UniProtKB/Swiss-Prot annotation:
Keywords: Membrane, Viral envelope protein, Virion. InterPro entries: Baculo_ODV-E66_core, Chondroitin_lyas, ODV-E66_C_baculovirus. One of its GO terms (cellular component) is membrane. Its main location: virion. It comes from Lymantria dispar multicapsid nuclear polyhedrosis virus. Component of the polyhedra envelope. Belongs to the baculoviridae E66 family. This is Occlusion-derived virus envelope protein E66.
Length: 664
């Protein structure tokens, strides 16, 4: 019978107990065998790692030369990752250190040293050393290291007792460590070493899988779609920490999923939903929008490109506000904002990426190099409006001892897609960045067009803000000569930045170059005057094109008839109560009838659509490019994006939205 039926007997026979023990041992042996056979494959899927380590072991009690792991949490994390990397080398047949006796002894001695330096019992609401924010090294990285080393050394040294003791103390439950309860992505990582510890205790996989907290984690990795909260949402965007588009957590946990399938059944993980989720944000090169990756500021994952086969095309998450395009020439992705979706999440050590997450507007050309951000450069990226600090990233600290998410105080966003083009427009107010703006982004065959309109500083500024158009990292890409002359047509690393004026509107500032030696970057920028931004009239307009296609681009931007503008009463627009009453009033208005739509001249939206614009002053514009895109009266769930009108060489974007669905 099942283990459950056996365990309910008052006094199991010696034979049944022996059978249970044998079954449990088989589960442990099978798991360790599978783990060893797939070690290199799974390690290659692991985002956080030190691959092919060469750091010298030491005999001074610190495990590795140059590290102080028993006092420095950063060094401790480096030590754990290095041990994992050496364990992989030890079990990789093609590696020079394959089954090396000296390496085996050093790995064994390192775990023994770890055991004698850790406090037992584990601290509560505090890391063993360092700040509270350093918990991650001890709750996630360390148990993975202990598991990895114990399995790698099987047949050479037996670390079972030490591994059991460490995991028991620091992972007493799959969702609990150091006195803190963990959920979602963290729990996915913690649960696997916990299950291994239970196998070392002699439990079977079936018995482990029946534990309530393990069942909770298995429920998470089943990846059912959810309407709100943690998990894969109905539009396939992944959320963690309730309101954060935290695909990085999913990426960091991806390597564990096959282990769960091996232990608990091949259908534990819903790979279809997982595929759609990864496809929404990723690319074959591993690039992704920074807001969908880690809090330390990143546009590249060294494993994301290896998870699935990415198809070219355009995909969007209507309610989570994500738009992604993949073409043979470039990858593009932009995120919008919604009232209950965090535009930024900070922790005690990562607090300078708010602008990067909220305002990155760029393309990643297929033939361009990818340079990940340095700590000094996180605040400088294409699309970022510099309105608080011109020379270094803006710091927006966490409000707790752990992570804090930040929501926009006003947000409306809508997106529309075809097979070869995508558009996103939004109005957003970001208190922590002292900004409110309207944003219009169009991805087409040749690259990206972008317009910021009605840019406003919430608190007046005394300097001229500017929008970053292109960035040259002079440290990581020092082989490319420094920029010396500004131009309204500037090419760098496969991307050509192109300046646009708007017909029937005041000319915009020419691009200018700014060099920041202390940061190690040069920026191509478009300046907006302080007077304009203080008055809420700042404008920036440019294209980022694949360099090989730039010469054939014929984009022009046209400000339409003034009668297409509609403004709200200023007092009503700037007050929360007025905004709410306005939105309620708009919901009562009737949508334009099909008859009204049929009899409207091409290029002009029905008047009743204009009256439903919740954005206040909304700048319709026409984008002429060599694109063949067809999308009429696009409807994305409850979001209405009217008059994405297409002719052979003309895409007229007249983005008029109802309030229904714009915020969510």
């Amino acid at each position: 019978g099942s283990f459950a039926s056996v365990s309910q007997r008052a006094e199991p026979t010696a034979a049944s107990a022996a059978a249970i023990a044998e079954l449990a041992n088989l589960d442990l042996d099978d798991f360790e065998r599978y783990y060893t056979l797939t070690l290199l494959e799974k390690f290659n899927q692991k985002a956080e790692k030190i691959a092919n380590p060469t750091r010298q072991f030491s005999q001074d009690g610190n495990v590795f030369a140059g590290l102080s792991p028993w006092s420095s949490p950063v060094d401790f994390g480096t030590c754990m990752h290095t041990l994992i990397g050496y364990g992989v080398r030890f079990r990789t047949p093609a590696d020079a250190l394959y089954l090396n006796d000296e390496l085996a002894f050093n790995l064994y001695a390192a775990i023994v040293e770890l055991y004698y330096n850790l406090p037992f019992p584990a601290p509560v609401n505090q890391a063993p050393w360092g700040a509270q924010a350093d918990w991650y090294h001890f709750s996630i990285t360390m148990p993975e290291c202990v598991q990895n080393t114990c399995i790698a050394l099987r047949g050479f040294y037996d670390l079972s007792d030490i591994a059991r003791a460490i995991i028991d103390a620091y992972l007493p439950a799959p969702t609990f460590s150091l006195g803190w309860q963990r959920t979602a992505g963290n729990a996915m990582r913690m649960c696997l070493p916990y299950c291994y510890g239970q196998l070392l205790h002699g439990l079977s996989a079936a018995e482990i899988g029946a534990q309530p907290e393990v069942r909770y984690v298995l429920g998470l990795i089943a990846f059912p779609r959810v309407a709100t909260g943690n998990g894969i949402h109905m539009d396939f965007a992944y959320f963690d920490h309730t309101d954060v588009r935290a695909t990085a957590y999913l990426i960091n946990s991806y390597f564990t999923f096959s282990y769960y399938n091996f232990l608990f059944g091949s259908h534990v993980v819903n790979m279809d939903n997982l595929y759609r989720c990864i496809s929404l944000v990723g690319s074959a090169r591993g690039t992704a929008h920074p807001a969908l990756l880690s809090r330390n500021g990143s546009q590249f994952s060294n494993v994301l490109g290896h998870f699935i086969a990415y198809a070219d095309g355009v995909v969007s998450a209507d309610f989570s506000k994500i738009l992604t395009i993949r073409t043979p020439r470039y990858f593009g992705s932009v995120v919008g904002q919604a009232p209950n979706v965090a535009y930024y999440e900070a922790d005690p050590t990562n607090n300078t990426h708010a602008a990067l997450w909220a305002m990155t507007r760029k393309i990643w050309p297929a033939d361009g190099a990818v340079f990940n951000y340095r700590a000094q450069t996180v605040g400088f990226e294409s699309g970022v409006i510099l309105a608080s600090n011109l020379n270094e990233p803006v710091v927006v600290p966490t409000t707790t001892t752990s992570t804090s998410s930040f929501l926009p105080s006003l947000a409306h966003t809508a997106a529309a897609t075809t097979q070869s083009a995508g558009a996103m427009c939004m109005r957003v107010r970001l208190e922590e960045l002292n900004l409110e703006f309207y944003s219009y982004t169009l991805y087409h065959a040749g690259g990206m067009f972008h317009l910021y309109d009605n840019v406003k500083a919430l608190a007046p500024v005394s300097f001229n803000p500017r929008c970053v158009v292109l960035v040259h990292d002079t440290v990581q890409n020092s082989s490319v000569p420094a920029w010396s002359v500004a131009s309204n047509l500037k090419t760098y690393n496969g991307t050509t930045a192109k300046h646009h004026n708007i017909t029937n509107a005041s000319s915009l500032a020419n691009f200018s170059i700014r060099t920041l030696p202390a940061v190690g970057v040069q920026t191509l920028e478009q300046i907006m005057s302080a007077d304009a931004v203080n008055a809420g009239l700042g404008v920036s307009c440019f294209s980022l094109l694949v360099a090989s296609e730039a010469a054939t681009d014929t984009t022009s931007v046209i400000k339409m008839d003034v009668n297409t503008f509609r403004d709200l009463d200023a007092k009503q627009r700037d007050s929360a109560g007025g905004e709410l009453s306005h939105r309620r009033a708009q919901r009562r208005q009737l949508s334009p009838t099909d008859d009204q739509r049929r009899h409207q001249p091409l290029g002009r939206p029905p008047h009743s659509i204009l009256r439903q614009d919740p954005f206040g002053p909304l700048l319709p514009f026409a984008h002429r490019a060599q694109s063949q895109v067809g999308l009429h009266y696009a409807r994305r769930r409850r979001v209405r994006l009217r008059q994405l009108r297409v002719q052979s060489v003309s895409i007229q974007l007249l983005m008029m939205m109802t309030t229904q669905g714009c915020g969510r």
